[in-house]
Amino acid sequence: MAKGTPRRNWSREETILAYELYCRTSFGRIHSRNPEIIELANLIGRTSGSVALKMSNLARFDPELQKRNITAMPHGSKMDGIVFEEFSKDWQELSYQAQIIRAQLQNKEVAEIVDLADIESIPPGEYRERMMKTRVGQYFFRKSVLNSYGNRCCITGINKADLLIASHIKPWAVSDEHTERTNPSNGLCLNALHDRAFDKGLITLDGQYRIIISDRSRDVEMDKETAAWFWKYDKQCIVLPDKFLPGKSFIEYHNDVVFQR
């Protein structure tokens, strides 16, 4: 910033964009060299360093960091707290509002930014907007969950993105659309096989984040090598994310309702 140039306060819209990107970015990648941070900085006319700093400021409101005694940047604006408080209770709205703001700044439609080409054929109206919100929320959920786990399966460590799924702990169909469906704490990063097993209740987690395999899995036909590989993770702790720890209430729901005992 040139000497004598007045400091420009962050607007609500800019703060929403920074918070949405914060949610989609692992802590180790919150720095001025991150291409996505550079892209956002260019979009809003700021330096990548200032965007990275804003994201670090937002981290101080994260209750999970506070529980784990992880120190975030101690300073920030009142707007940071307002945005964090508002949208940490409505993840779907955070993801959607951020894409609306981004689209307006780029003079584009939301469908162009998040690759929603198949929705463009739906006539404008309430149904189309609801579909767009859902798809944008799914995009946000996947990015947030996978990045929180470092793009690795939390059970096996597989790190091929094409083989990874952002799995819902409490199933999407029965989750609240505002507080649960796109809440990254309702997600696990799993490979396709373990995602399916988790979805069908053949595996679950306990309160200590240990993997519990259902005895019903023994009825599944598989060769000895596959069985040994599948069962070796029983009672092992998952690799925990650097933020958005799996919510205990979501795990309890999966234990009680989904898991096959």
Task: Kindly give the residue locations of the regions a language model identified.
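Short, Lys/Arg-enriched anionic-surface-contact patches
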Residues: 2-21, 132
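Short alpha-helical "recognition helix" segments of helix-turn-helix
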Residues: 36-41
